[in-house]
Amino acid sequence: MPITPEHIRATVSEYLVAHPAEKAALSGVLEGLDRGDDLTGRNTGPLHVTAGAVLVDDGGDVLFIRHNVFRKYLLPGGHLEVEDGSLMNAALRELGEETGIAAGVAPLSPRPVHIDVHDIPANDAKGEPAHQHADVRYLFRTTGPVEVTLQEEEVSGWEWRSPDTLADATLRQRVLAAIRTSS
C-alpha cells in the first residue's frame, strides 16, 4: 500500500504537536499537501518526502554510512517506494537496503525523532534538478547483534559513531536524550 498524503499530514501534524517551533521549517511540506502535490515520488516538485533511520547500538553509538553520490558519511535513508505503506516502514526498508540490517532493530518511538528539510543539488546523471528533501527520521535501537552488508551501488563504508558527531544540533540533542531515557 502506498504512503498517502493523509499519512504524511498526520505524521507531520503529530510531530509538530511535540515540536511546534519547527512549523515554519516544515511549511513547504504542509503547503505542498494543501496544494495536492505528490510528495512521495523522487521526480515530483521542488520538495519531496524521504525517510531516514537513526540506528543506535547497545553502546549508544549511531550507524553512519558513506554515501557514494555525496561522498560523505550520512544516516541511512532515501526515497519512498510504493510498497512502503508508512514512513517508518520506508525508513526500515532503506536501512535494510543500504546496510543489510533487516532484523534486530526496534523503534524507540512511533513518532519521528526529527524531520529535516534540506537542499539536494542537481544530479545531471539522473536528470534531477536541484530540489529539497523533507527527511522524516525515525530512531531505532539494536535489539541484538547486527551484521552490516553494504549495498555497494550506493554505499561504500559504514561506521558506528558517537551521537555527539551528529551534525544537526536538534537531532543530536534528541538522540542523546532518547539514549539517556532508554538506558
Q: Model segments located where?
A:
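NUDIX/MutT-family hydrolases
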Residues: 137-178
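Predominantly extracellular/luminal regions of secreted and cell-surface proteins
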Residues: 1-25, 99
